[in-house]
């Protein structure tokens, strides 16, 4: 059976790890600004859906930063906002010394995108400024990379679907920096090629683009970063629900990469403003079989029975239970570990840190 890689467990761990910074942060008045856009009633439905996802994400960011003791400004710009008004808001936060980080929720309206380039690079905590940000990729991309990393210690084949998008580019950048050579796929490519990968990462935002025809039992982990709100209040990811029982491990939607993004932003702002040696959250992989052993063991199991075939999902489940993981660890859990540091952005003395323990309120 498929093991779910819980992003909510990662976020819970991050909140516990970083709660003890709150008493040091809160008196400083340090602030994070989150700016988002509102659709007009006449906008196309797909645009309204994207901005609804942006709203949900912005609200979760506000909660995460406030949990750490930062003040959080949630700036909601009205439909049809002009470049001048948007630029004025952005420049105000650039000039405000109390504002330590700025996030502009993506996507901005096309005619406003150039204004984002005016953000102070030192406050670009989500890597919106290509080539000028202190970070190599956005928090979502880093979170995806860190979820995939413990499944990829032996340099397996990794497919990234949606590799040309904002998040996808970041994922590919981080994988290549770590020595991987990912298979990059986008709309119009032959998506069935993902069958040949050991790890599948999908960041298209196209509901159900990956079906049971694409997802395979030998896939160590399928990481689904899609998040598309539906009219009935549900949320759909890139992977169809019918494929959820096929891979060995999977990040669910909702409750997968979204919370991981929040944990990454919390870690970044603490490292940037409070403690450069902050302990990092970590994902420990669920059990999985390497493809060579998976194939060999499945063939042996099929030979041992007299019926025509052993169903693939049931066979994979029995094999994992009987043989145990050839790589990986017990089911998903979160353990602290050091991670690459972000920038040392600090214009004044760091707040004095209390002994670790305790924490702020839970949102």
Where are the regions a protein language model picked out?
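Non-Sec secretion/translocation targeting segments of pathogen effectors
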Residues: 308, 315-363
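Short beta-strand elements in bilobed, periplasmic/extracellular small-molecule ligand-binding domains
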Residues: 62-79, 181-185
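Rossmann-like adenosine-cofactor binding region
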Residues: 187-275, 281
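C-terminal helix-to-coil terminal segments
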Residues: 2-5, 9, 260-307, 313-314
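Glycine-rich phosphate/diphosphate-binding loop of Rossmann-like nucleotide-binding domains
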Residues: 42, 46-60, 135-225, 247
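Anion-binding alpha/beta catalytic cores of soluble intermediary-metabolism enzymes, centered on
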Residues: 4-7, 101-155, 190
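Positively charged, low-complexity intrinsically disordered leader regions
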Residues: 1-30
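Short, well-structured alpha-helical segments in soluble
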Residues: 85-97
């Amino acid at each position: 059976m498929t093991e779910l890689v819980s992003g909510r467990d990662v976020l819970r761990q991050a909140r516990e790890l970083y709660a003890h910074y709150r008493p040091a942060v809160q008196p400083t008045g340090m602030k994070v600004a989150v700016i988002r856009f509102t659709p007009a009633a006449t906008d196309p439905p797909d645009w309204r859906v994207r901005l609804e996802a942006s709203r949900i994400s912005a609200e979760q960011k506000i909660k995460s930063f406030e949990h750490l003791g930062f003040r959080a400004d949630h700036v909601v710009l009205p439909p049809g906002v002009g470049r001048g008004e948007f630029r004025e808001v952005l420049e105000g936060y650039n000039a405000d010394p109390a504002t330590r980080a700025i996030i502009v929720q993506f996507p901005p309206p096309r005619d406003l995108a150039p204004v984002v380039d005016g953000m102070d690079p030192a406050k670009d905590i989500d890597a919106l400024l290509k080539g000028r940000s202190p970070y190599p990729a956005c928090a979502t991309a880093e979170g995806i990379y860190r979820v995939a990393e413990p499944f990829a210690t032996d340099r397996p084949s990794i497919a990234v679907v949606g590799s040309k998008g904002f998040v996808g580019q970041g994922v590919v950048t981080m994988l290549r920096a770590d020595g991987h050579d990912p298979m990059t796929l986008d709309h119009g490519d032959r998506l069935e090629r993902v069958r040949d990968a050991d790890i599948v990462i999908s960041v298209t935002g196209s509901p159900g683009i990956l079906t049971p025809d694409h997802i395979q039992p030998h896939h160590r982990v399928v990481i689904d970063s899609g998040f598309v709100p539906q009219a009935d209040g549900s949320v759909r990811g890139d992977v169809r629900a019918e494929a959820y029982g096929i891979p060995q491990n999977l990040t669910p939607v909702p409750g997968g990469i979204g919370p991981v993004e929040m944990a990454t932003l919390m870690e970044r702002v603490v490292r940037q403003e409070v403690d450069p040696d902050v302990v990092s959250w970590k994902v420990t992989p669920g059990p999985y079989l390497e493809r060579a052993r998976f194939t060999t063991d499945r063939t042996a199991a099929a030979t041992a029975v007299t019926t025509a075939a052993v169903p693939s999902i049931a066979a994979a489940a029995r094999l994992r239970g009987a043989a145990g993981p050839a790589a990986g660890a017990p089911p998903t859990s979160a353990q602290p570990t050091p991670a690459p540091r972000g920038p040392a952005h600090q214009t004044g003395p760091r707040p004095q840190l209390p002994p670790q323990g305790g924490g702020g309120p839970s949102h």
